[in-house]
């Protein structure tokens, strides 16, 4: 699931420290890492929030003209600067030529989604005809489950991780109820072992092996929203197929974050949103994938006009010519204004490439982990200082850019103090603070400054 072997983050930090004749925690290491960063120019493609504009900022603690430390791309990505330009292009076209905009221009409205789908294929590792840009994530999940979840008396379960994102949980629960099944019997959730935060792959594979004959669909998140755990998508897919199950994934926290190869991994179906790592703005246009092997066998349960072949769509004879594959699942006219914001971001990804972004991300988050463990690891019974625990897996192949932190003191106070100092992250129940340095627009110096602020907050808490 990873690019070719590369220098481990801790080794890179120590190498640079040796070259500079300084401690690995020195600020000069962060600055050198930024100098060596081949992707640093892409930060200029985004608007970075200023300290003065943040609602929870304490201006007595910061320089109001400084950029915020924005570590929340796992919730909402920053705005690409070209979004306004692309929106204005379509608004101007609408104003000047009205309905002619459906057929002319850079993004003809009738094929607005299709005009940018080629930019998505390398991000998810799929053929163009396997991808549709439409709707919102949970809408797409419902549409996909209506076609892939066909329970029988013997094979009636959907397998998912416990504490999946609520929207996934509700969607699966309601799909089971739609078929008149008992949720308690047909919704199979895998929990971490007692005392552990994340799932072990061997436990997932064991459940699939033992219960697979009764499982209709295996449906996991690609990367867990709370723990930050990246699941082994090809291994889960292979195990599910060996037992005759369809295998699908919610890639909300994986797309644009880690490398994906949905076609080569033989995933049956997947869906994702675009407002996190894909930076399309709140409620942005979502995506869906169906493997080409299902193009002529899996049909949409609900059909609309935009699932009809374009070549005969305007014959108006009400004789459906369904587009094979996932594009037959499209129901309505693509929302061109949402297409614009996604277009602006996908062009940046095309220039940066997922392989290069992932390589930087491994180093960036590894540097964050190194500093956290250096300053705030250990056992609070030994040193009586507040301790930061990282519940996200330490191995790069088992996580994306996000680290989920828990504290030996109340997270609410820590979070409030971070906000006052211009750190944009979030807290998630029950105990986590999520921080996600994004390689497109975050720097190693951002990480260094975050650690300085966190350390000052925890030191102050200790003194008080």
UniProtKB/Swiss-Prot annotation:
High levels in liver and kidney. Also detected in heart, retina, ovary. Lung, testis and brain. The modification N6-(pyridoxal phosphate)lysine is found at residue 276. The keyword DNA-binding does not apply. Its main location: cytoplasm. Optimum pH is about 9.0 with L-kynurenine as substrate, and about 8.5 with DL-3-hydroxykynurenine as substrate. One of its GO terms (biological process) is quinolinate biosynthetic process. The modification N-acetylmethionine is found at residue 1. GO terms for cellular component: cytoplasm; cytosol; mitochondrion. Its EC number is 3.7.1.3. Inhibited by o-methylbenzoylalanine (OMBA). Pathway: Amino-acid degradation; L-kynurenine degradation; L-alanine and anthranilate from L-kynurenine: step 1/1; Cofactor biosynthesis; NAD(+) biosynthesis; quinolinate from L-kynurenine: step 2/3. Keywords: Acetylation, Cytoplasm, Hydrolase, Pyridine nucleotide biosynthesis, Pyridoxal phosphate. Its cofactor is pyridoxal 5'-phosphate. InterPro entries: Kynureninase, PyrdxlP-dep_Trfase, PyrdxlP-dep_Trfase_major, PyrdxlP-dep_Trfase_small. It comes from the Eukaryota. The keyword Magnesium does not apply. Pyridoxal 5'-phosphate binds at residues 137-138, 165-168, 221, 250, 253, 275, 305, 333. It holds the Pfam family KYNU_C. HAMAP family: Kynureninase. Belongs to the kynureninase family. PANTHER family: KYNURENINASE. Homodimer. Catalyzes the cleavage of L-kynurenine (L-Kyn) and L-3-hydroxykynurenine (L-3OHKyn) into anthranilic acid (AA) and 3-hydroxyanthranilic acid (3-OHAA), respectively. Has a preference for the L-3-hydroxy form. Also has cysteine-conjugate-beta-lyase activity. This is Kynureninase. The lineage of its organism: Eukaryota, Metazoa, Chordata, Craniata, Vertebrata. The gene is Kynu.
């Amino acid at each position: 699931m990873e690019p070719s072997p590369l220098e481990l983050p801790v080794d890179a930090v120590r190498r640079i420290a040796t070259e500079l004749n300084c401690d690995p925690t020195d600020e000069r290491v962060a600055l050198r890492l930024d100098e060596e960063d081949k992707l640093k120019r892409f930060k200029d493609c985004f608007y970075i929030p200023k300290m003065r504009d943040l609602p929870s900022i304490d201006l007595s603690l910061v320089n109001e003209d400084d950029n915020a430390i924005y570590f929340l791309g796992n919730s909402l990505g920053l705005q690409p600067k070209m979004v306004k330009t692309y929106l204005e292009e379509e608004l101007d076209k609408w104003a000047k030529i009205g309905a002619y905009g459906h057929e002319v221009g850079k993004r003809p409205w009738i094929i607005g989604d299709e005009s940018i789908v080629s930019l998505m294929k390398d991000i998810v590792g799929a053929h163009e005809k396997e991808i549709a840009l439409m709707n919102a994530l949970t809408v797409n999940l419902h549409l996909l489950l209506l076609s892939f979840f066909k329970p029988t008396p013997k094979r009636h379960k959907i397998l998912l991780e416990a504490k999946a994102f609520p929207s996934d949980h509700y969607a699966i629960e309601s799909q089971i109820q739609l078929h008149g099944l008992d949720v308690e019997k047909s919704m199979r959730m895998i929990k971490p072992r007692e005392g552990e935060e994340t799932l072990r792959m061997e436990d997932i594979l064991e459940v699939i092996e033992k219960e697979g004959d009764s499982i209709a669909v295996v449906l996991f998140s690609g990367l867990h929203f709370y723990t930050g755990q990246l699941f082994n998508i090809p291994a889960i897919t292979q195990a599910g197929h060996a037992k005759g199950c369809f295998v699908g994934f919610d890639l909300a926290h994986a797309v644009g974050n880690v490398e994906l190869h949905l076609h080569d991994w033989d995933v049956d179906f997947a869906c994702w949103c675009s407002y996190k790592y894909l930076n399309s703005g709140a409620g942005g246009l979502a995506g869906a994938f169906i493997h080409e092997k299902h193009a002529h066998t899996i049909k949409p349960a609900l059909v609309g006009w935009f699932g009809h072949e374009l070549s005969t769509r305007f014959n108006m004879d009400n004789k459906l010519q369904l587009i094979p594959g996932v594009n037959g699942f499209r129901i309505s006219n693509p929302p061109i204004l949402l297409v614009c914001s996604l277009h602006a971001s996908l062009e940046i990804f095309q220039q940066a490439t997922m392989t290069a972004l992932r390589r930087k991300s491994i180093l960036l988050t590894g540097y964050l982990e190194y500093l956290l463990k250096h300053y705030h690891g250990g056992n609070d019974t030994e040193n009586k200082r507040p301790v930061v625990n990282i519940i996200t897996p330490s191995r790069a192949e088992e996580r994306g850019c996000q680290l989920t932190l828990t504290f030996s003191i109340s997270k609410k106070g820590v979070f409030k103090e971070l906000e006052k100092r211009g750190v944009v992250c979030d807290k998630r129940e029950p105990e986590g603070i999520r921080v996600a340095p994004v390689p497109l627009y975050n720097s190693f110096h951002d990480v260094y400054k975050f650690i300085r602020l966190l350390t000052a907050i925890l030191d102050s808490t200790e003194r008080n």
